[in-house]
Amino acid sequence: MNNLEKWRFYLKDMQSPNSYINMGFYYMISCALQRRVYLNATKMPLFANQYIVLVGDAGLGKSMVIRHVTEFLKYHLLYDKRSLGVKTLPPGIPKRELTNKEKAEEMARENPEMFKEVMSLMGVDTSKMSFSKLKDRPDPLLIPVAANCTTYEALTRSLADSIRSIQPEMNGQTHMWVKNGIYSYSTACFSLSEVSSLFKKHHEDVIRFLHETYDCEEDYVYETKNQGIDRIKRVCVNLLGGSTFTFMNDAFSNRLLAEGFASRATFVCEDRPRFYKFAIPEFSEEQMACGVDILIHIKRLTTLFGQVSYTPEAYEYFRFYFEEVYPKILPGLPRALIDWNARMNIHVQKLAMAVHFGDSVEMTITLPSCQKAMNILEDLMTRMCDAVGATGKNPLADVGNRILKTLEKFGPKTKQEIWTDFVSDVRLVELEEVLEYLFATGKIKKIEGERLKSMRETNKLTDDIKERLQ
């Protein structure tokens, strides 16, 4: 099994849709790569960070995936002296020797008085040393995970405190980012069961921050009203959040979220779980072993640094699509996805890095990884309009989308049954207007017994794209 298959097996008893599980895995890989691995030249690097929002009704298993992703991201500590054999996980990573700094920190944490005595013998003044908060301070994470709900000020402060450094193997070469053999950067990932906790009203600064940090610029500078100037070096932010269609529609309709965020985020929309399950059993030894393999791979990824390249076949695949195929299909794309498609070349390359490094530590991306990334995004695009389609002013458009989702989820219904479901949202004359539009655009049709059936196709572009790319 490859690592994605191991992740699926690890979560095999979760009812979450496959797309949630898969994108949760790729988000985890992007978080592990942080701001260290990049495509393109060092002057205009493209990093693997992603903003991913799992959209669906309550009970689909969004939180299940996000919770397990967060547990994996939080496992490795910055100064990690554990093995993977603690408590529930079988042995996987051997313990290593502590550095002198780590030994001193451990002594100060566990026995402050002995630490003071040792420091005194070394001639250090310990009279003003305070250890009252040291025991309560959590060990820093190797991959920093930001707070669930935060103000802009707390966000920038958290990032400023999340500086990570590595000593990359340069093999006698130089790099403009590496100073005195060390590369430092500020990184954080948001794993939010409810993305609304971050995107509340009056959080315009947070939204603007996510817009500007998506490209992982060398410097992030923002002048606050009362706190002076915030400057964060080499920032990198990843986001995985859960949301409902209702919140997404309200957020876009009220301009709480705008096109800027919609073009940078990938929305994974589903309307039903993989299956229904009364209770989730304990993890088996085989599942736990798969979890260990993934944790080991994540640890390896945190040591990578440098420029990533494509094989000639992989580069030609993307070049042909975006220079020759994409301009021809662009006029037929849904209006709601125009902004997102403007950045599709960025989305697919970020995802291609996540797909490639999901199993490899080699710095060359191959054609299969590029093809897989393209296929994943094509599949997600078929439903993405459900999340970003509410940017207009017509409230009946939202009703039309919800009627389509109802017919897809529960099967054909009569007009009377639909009116019963939506009587609190529309009057009869408005419902007839919506149904007339759905008929005229071929999105629904009548079948036996005057029942209405959804005709929404999976993706009209997919077959055409695949034919052109062969």
Question: What are the roles of these predicted feature ranges?
Answer:
Residues M1-Q470:
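Phosphate-handling catalytic cores of nucleic-acid transaction enzymes
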